[in-house]
Amino acid sequence: MGLSWKWTALLSLLSALLCLIGPALAVKEHDFKKCAQAGFCKRNRDYADKAASQSSTWISPYQVALDSPSLKDGQIQAVILKTINAAGEKVRLPVTISFLQSGVARVTIDEERRQNKDIELRHGSVARKERYNEAAKWSIVGGLEPDLKAEIVHQDDSQINVQYGLEGKFEAVIKLSPFAIDFRRDGVSHIKFNERGLFNFEHWRPKVERPEGEENPEEESTWWDETFGGSTDTKPRGPESVALDISFHGYEHVYGIPEHTGPLSLKQTRGGDGNYDEPYRMYNADVFEYILDSPMTLYGSIPFMQAHRKDSSVGLLWLNAADTWVDIIKTKGSSNPLSLNAEAPSSTQTHWISEAGIFDVFVFLGPTPQDISKKYGELTGTTAMPQEFALGYHQCRWNYISEDDVKDVDRRFDKWQIPYDVIWLDIEYTDEIKYFTFDPHSFTDPISIGKQLDSHGRKLVVIIDPHIKRVDNYPINEQLQSLDLAVHDKDGKIYEGDCWPGLSNWIDCFNPKAREWWKTLYKYENFNGTMENTFIWNDMNEPSVFHGPETTMPKDNLHFDDWEHRDVHNLNGMTYHHSTFEALKSRKKGEFRRPFVLTRAFFSGSQRFGAMWTGDNLADWGHLQTSITMLINQGISGFPFSGADVAGFFGDPESELITRWYQTAAFYPFFRAHAHIDTRRREPYLLGDPYTAIATAALRLRYSLLPSWYTTFFYANRDGSPILRPMFWTHPSSEGGLAIDDQFFLGSTGLLVKPIAEKDKYSTDIWIPDDEVYYDYFTYKTVKTEQGKHVTLDAPIDRIPMLIRGGHIITRRDIPRRSSALMRFDDYTLVISVSKNNEAEGELYVDDGDSYDYLEGQYIYRKFTLTPNVLSSTDAEGRDTKKIKPGKWLKAMRDVHVQKIIVVGGTPDVWNRKEVQVQSEGRTWSANVDYHAADGAYYAVINRVGVRVGENWSIKLD
């Protein structure tokens, strides 16, 4: 057995290293297209240059047919006519402008001839003739109710003005010739479509075969077959891109369109000092050791952009799943000569370019960042309410090599008294990388792993990728092929490519039958070795294909219903993620537990199905710094359950770096350590003194704050709000914070955090957004601050720079435990940071952290309020909780109390006392108070409070 295991391990390692040759080369930028190498991007950039060169004489060749517009049930339906030659020949483009109850506007444009399937395909292709129009089917889940009060308030031969939204504050001014739209709020222009005349809808046209020896004009050279990196894209429908310039008037700062490694406030892309010379690209790809400060594409895409200026936010969703590029230019407006010292407002001009599909854009007019997040969440869904364990610490590497190895790691965490919740298995746990199997030599009894972990409430996550090994006597692949559930190549055959197992096929999760089949594979009786505490990691779902064009599959591959891969590429990862999410919900009849599924690839809507991480980063300071910005951007783009590999996937981090990374990651929404197979082991108990102790302290800080984390996720689930909140989101009136991306507030807790992400740095400057009082979280000292200025904090290696803003009440569980499950029925501590007005408030949301019973009212949701005269707890929704029939969990929570209250700040004459009187449910009793006033820290500790966390109570302070 021992010899067999060694040989198997060696062969697996050699196989992995051989496979690694493919993706490792992909880090080189020349393996990924630049705009000039992508025909449709080059054509549209050239189109923009042509328009700019002609300036005021440029006329966009698109106009709305004068007899076509009509408004009915909140929609204007019309036809845009595109003039395509000097003879005046025109192409008809049906357009629908929808005004929604939410105040969001939607514009869709299609191509009539392709709607009617009146085109010819080249190369004998069987691909769909229509433009892809199903992205909304996957991404949009609500918010489409029409605004029946929308009305035309002005119409003539040149334009139509539609008033819509709450109290009619929004207006769309639709210019008929050339076609353009001006979206206004309170009469002021905020977003303009086609202001620069760059709208371009490449209509279908037949290929004209030229006489032998005659070359195609340069404009046509990229219309048809296109070769890159040795792969030829046949493009059977010819050129079909859609592009539009969208201007944000008066907005210098725009955010979003993840996933990229640049700053939060997006850079310009047309060159110049400090700017990019390439557009931001969204084309999900497996990019090893990705480059920092780059617009280069990464693993996921969310085509959502938000613009913000003082007291105003707007945004848009470009709902297109094809390869997409975005150019950004920032301009200064014209100064008013009558205004003394008036600085001209900046504006941002964007140019969106997608290879295929229809034009489908949603416009959000705010006015606040919270409005944008909420409306986007109504459309695409909000973050799934996670299981509580998912917010704990996850320990992973490629790879824990045997069940004994896994059990030993688990025991060592306990020996060192380091909390963790989940241990992960990468691809080597399988039998020769055949998913839904365990290696029969190194994982002979995987159930024993699950049972050992379960004894302390811990979980196991195993990886399942979408590539299925193409080999005989493997039932999963045999079923995939016999049921015809795989992706096909352009000729209609099952597509074959290389990935970790070698020759592989890919499940096509656009196929409803494939999704149903996928569910059967996860049932406990079919996935032997799994149990109730086993969860799933979806990797490589861009999809990643070794040696494929740009490390993925050919664009002319065919999916279910004969849609080309080019049409759906950025959706592919989400459909796989969604399929696994639904599969975990149906593992056992009658088991209604929340799934946990991690994904690498994502799109708008992926937030409904679990967490994401930023892929294969490096163990260096730059990647640590960038991770903070990337995760903040994920949050304001609607996908806040996000993380990055701690402390870098590639490389062996120095002790200082790994320590600072743990301190930073204690504030990642998704907190997982992960490392490459060639790295040294670096579990926190191996770091040595003093680093193990410091990392452990960061982990314990995370666990103590889990009640606040869980409440913050509840908000994200409820209204789409980000977990890590940038300064512009929390303080939209403070102009100094619009570009800050290295500090954040944790939800609405008032915790202001600025992790140390530089070598040999032992102090830092935190920007203060308002004139409220701030306290040091660890010492309770009042920090001398000034609105709009920086304050310097000491940050020795064992300290996380962290303030708590006055006016907040946060919840903690302070007893160290091995896992979050073992803390579930621990008592709570309240930490109150008193505002300068001697007030504070906060909330606690808690449920069983596992099931969907919260949908039936099985939860506790409390509002804590401090006024100058009373501290109280009431139901946050005003429910009469006595009328709720308690289930098992709610009954158990009757024994859970708020036992300690720490009051930071406030006036000594209120808190410098020996005891307070506590009232709850008709009873009154005394609780002792310890008052501290030394070294600039004024705080009171109320001990043995003894109030049930789910009941009303008060402490009067007269």
Positions of PLM-derived features:
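Fungal secretory targeting signals
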Residues: 1-26
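N-terminal accessory segment at the very beginning of proteins
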Residues: 20-391, 396-398, 403-411, 422, ...
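Short, well-ordered loop/turn elements at secondary-structure boundaries
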Residues: 91-92, 156, 166-168, 176-177, ...
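Aromatic- and carboxylate-enriched substrate-binding clefts and catalytic-loop regions
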Residues: 124-126, 132-139, 419-695, 730-732, ...
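Internal mixed beta-strand/loop scaffold within catalytic domains of large alpha/beta enzymes
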Residues: 192-193, 277-316, 573, 616-641, ...
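Short, hydrophobic/amphipathic alpha-helical packing segments
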Residues: 276, 280-283, 298-301, 515, ...
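Catalytic core of carbohydrate-active enzymes
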Residues: 581-596, 601-614, 623-630, 634-644, ...
